[in-house]
Amino acid sequence: MSLTLIQLVSEQTLQNLLPALALRPGQIIQVKSSDPRFKQTPRHFVDACKVAGLDATDFPLADTIPHDSPDIQETMQCLEAIIARHDKADLALNLTGGTKLMSIGAYRVAAAHGIPSLYTDTQNRREFVDAQTGRWAPFLPCLAEQVQKLTVPMVMAAQGKDFLEDSFTEPLLEFGREAWRLRLDYHEAISAWTGAIRNSLPRRNMRIDDRPAILRQFLQTPLPSTASAAAADYLDAAAQAGLLRVEPDGRAYLAAEPKKSSVERVSNLLDGAWLELAVADMARRGGRFADLHWSVEPEQRGDDYGETDLIAVDRQKLNLAVISCKTSTEHVSTLEHLSSWRDRARTLGGSHASGHLCLFRAKSPAQASDLCAMGKKMNIQVHIAEDIPACFAEPCSGAL
């Protein structure tokens, strides 16, 4: 018997993707309202399933209920028409998506025909909930196993997002770990040295010069030296990661190509983006965040989001985690950043995605308190200083 899964379309993409991964049906029939927000959602869901390897599953055109917000009766009429076209013994219903009225209508139809149905409870991280409308044969799979299969490309494909990214290397992650350790106690001394490097970069019109000859000359010029032992240790860690080249005489040079993007990348990693590597290293050693992606940007120009520091699957919240890393708030409007990050999270992972701000240093305890309060109102989790490893490096207490 080949299972046909009927599901309701809404913004809740994971609640539909997880049952598809679990049941691997021969066919998935999507039922959506006429709400224009969901016009492309069925196509994006198909793309996500293809990314997940459901190549043997058929996806007929979605059935559309001719109303932006269907009531119970309209939903029941649509589902009755679908059931009439199929052998009821092959059908199952996912009640999770759609509006509450659509879910009620779907439940009533499933109960009337004895069709098995389920609800995906991602909020409380339970197993798939058997709605007791029919008998599952043989039984519902384990939700925990499906969560382990989730990847960032799957979740973003369900939102219609393709992306490019940078690549982690073990030396870079080790640099992030060492940078965190050193900067906890010697941030000012190290920042003075990396700031001197930043100020030594060749510039034109306030930006890094993009002329290869100028950049080549800069890369052959020794970087500013430092008398700080901590900064010297930081230099050694950066050299081990391939960010600096140190000659036998002790002079250090930026290890980059004579291209603006390459020089900018290395200098940023030394001065501020080291925090992205530190958080990534913590997340890889912890148990909560899976399938970490770094420096994510749209594959297509003109897409509706910019570069994103880190993206991962949050196994505790069962959603996409969109993570911003800032060493300070010196050049950032905190309210504007939190607001834009909330929008970024929703753009990339849907209405249930969560935003995170990792801040290495706040200006004062009062600012830290204000930031956390603002973040709570905007559904952005703010982690400051030692709160960062508490979230990212610890085992996942609520993981399935």
What are these regions (language model features)?
Residues 1-44:
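N-terminal beta-strand-loop-alpha-helix module at the start
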Residues 2-7, 23-31, 56-58, 91-92, ...:
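Hydrophobic beta-strand segments of well-ordered beta-sheets in folded domains
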Residues 7-11, 31-35, 95-97, 297, ...:
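Structural motif
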Residues 27-95, 106:
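A broadly used, surface-exposed interaction patch
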Residues 92, 112-131:
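Short, acidic/small-residue loops that bind anionic groups at enzyme active sites
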Residues 100-114, 371:
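Short Gly/Thr/Asp-enriched flexible loops that form oxyanion-binding sites at enzyme active sites
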Residues 124-164:
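Beta-rich, aromatic/charged-enriched effector core domains that present basic-aromatic interfaces
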Residues 152-400:
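Intrinsically disordered, low-complexity Ser/Thr/Pro/Gly-rich regulatory segments
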